[in-house]
């Protein structure tokens, strides 16, 4: 299946009011959630779909209390850009796994916290 770069592109625009911004945020959120199974198979993520959806929700909840309309518009533009990059397979699996620190396949502690810990582990 060939990838069309403009398939997921959306024209940047400003929200007219808060109800318009809310509608656009919910539409973007639904797009992310609906594409979760496809993301899991494209990137061969070793995580269940429920964990991926929970992480998407956490990203949206992080910006829940933004109270300036221009800031919401910028966040929407960034969200659409991230969605396009993700669905066009312009990221690597490591980029996707960086969103899941606790489930990361690299491990939580890549480097020892002190010299003696590294020495005892045989890393130095």
Curated annotation (Swiss-Prot):
Provide the membrane topology annotation.
Answer: Peripheral membrane protein
Record keywords: Membrane included?
yes
Keyword Electron transport listed: yes
Q: Which residues cross the membrane?
A: none
Question: Where does this one sit in the cell?
Answer: Mitochondrion inner membrane
Q: Which UniProt keywords apply?
A: Electron transport, Membrane, Mitochondrion, Mitochondrion inner membrane, Respiratory chain, Transport
State a single Pfam family of this protein.
Complex1_LYR_2
Identify one Gene Ontology CC term for this UniProt entry: mitochondrial inner membrane
InterPro entries per UniProt: Complex1_LYR_NDUFA6_LYRM6, NADH_Ub_cplx-1_asu_su-6
Its chief place of residence is: mitochondrion
Similarity comment:
Belongs to the complex I LYR family.
According to its UniProt entry, the function of this protein is described as:
Accessory subunit of the mitochondrial membrane respiratory chain NADH dehydrogenase (Complex I), that is believed to be not involved in catalysis. Complex I functions in the transfer of electrons from NADH to the respiratory chain. The immediate electron acceptor for the enzyme is believed to be ubiquinone. The precise function of this subunit is unknown but believed to be important.
Q: Which PANTHER family match?
A: NADH DEHYDROGENASE [UBIQUINONE] 1 ALPHA SUBCOMPLEX SUBUNIT 6, NADH-UBIQUINONE OXIDOREDUCTASE B14 SUBUNIT
Cite the record's note on assembly. Answer: Complex I is composed of about 40 different subunits. Belongs to the peripheral arm of the complex, most likely the globular part.
Q: What's the protein name? A: NADH-ubiquinone oxidoreductase 14.8 kDa subunit
Q: What is the lineage of its organism?
A: Eukaryota, Fungi, Dikarya, Ascomycota, Pezizomycotina
Q: What gene is this protein a product of?
A: nuo14.8
